[in-house]
Curated annotation (Swiss-Prot):
<dbReference type="GO" id="GO:0090729">
    <property type="term" value="F:toxin activity"/>
</dbReference>
<comment type="function">
    <text>Thionins are small plant proteins which are toxic to animal cells. They seem to exert their toxic effect at the level of the cell membrane. Their precise function is not known.</text>
</comment>
<dbReference type="InterPro" id="IPR001010">
    <property type="entry name" value="Thionin"/>
</dbReference>
<keyword id="KW-0800">Toxin</keyword>
<feature type="propeptide" description="Acidic domain">
    <location>
        <begin position="67"/>
        <end position="131"/>
    </location>
</feature>
<protein>
    <recommendedName>
        <fullName>Type-5 thionin</fullName>
    </recommendedName>
</protein>
<keyword id="KW-0732">Signal</keyword>
<dbReference type="GO" id="GO:0006952">
    <property type="term" value="P:defense response"/>
</dbReference>
<dbReference type="GO" id="GO:0005576">
    <property type="term" value="C:extracellular region"/>
</dbReference>
<keyword id="KW-0611">Plant defense</keyword>
<comment type="similarity">
    <text>Belongs to the plant thionin (TC 1.C.44) family.</text>
</comment>
<keyword id="KW-0964">Secreted</keyword>
<feature type="signal peptide">
    <location>
        <begin position="1"/>
        <end position="29"/>
    </location>
</feature>
<keyword id="KW-1015">Disulfide bond</keyword>
Length: 131
């Protein structure tokens, strides 16, 4: 198995892990109650460029205390530490387990970092492997 194939597999695993984490935030994190219109509003809002925070406010859904506290005055620090933790646990694992000398692998690691930044800022979109 070549280094490029191994890098691609690592990138896919990275995106799958981030997708699972994002799914947990969406399912367990935001409470729109039993109102199907609020749920539909929130889910359709997430399809656009809006953040979880913006969609929750717009659709009158409640964020849990832990997620809502990210919007406090320490938000830049919280985002920075979240991104740093994500990169060190997910993206660095890609570097350590694959041949990171290829240009393709460097691109995957960079996109993993972008995905971590998007996740930590509350965005629900992950970096695409297709540009």
């Amino acid at each position: 198995m070549g280094g490029g194939q191994k890098g691609l597999e690592s990138a896919i695993v990275c995106l799958l892990v981030l997708g699972l984490v994002l799914e947990q935030v969406q399912v367990e994190g935001v409470d729109c109650g039993a109102n199907p219109f609020k749920v539909a509003c929130f889910n359709s809002c997430l399809l656009g460029p809006s953040t979880v925070f913006q969609c929750a406010d717009f659709c009158a859904c409640r964020l849990p205390a832990g997620l809502a506290s990210v919007r406090s005055s320490d938000e830049p620090n919280a985002i920075e530490y979240c991104s740093l933790g994500c990169r060190s646990s997910v993206c660095d694992n890609m570097i350590n387990t694959a041949d990171n000398s290829t240009e393709e692998m460097k691109l995957y690691v960079k996109r993993c970092g972008v995905a971590c930044d998007s996740f930590c800022k509350g965005d629900t979109l992950l970096a695409s492997l297709d540009d």
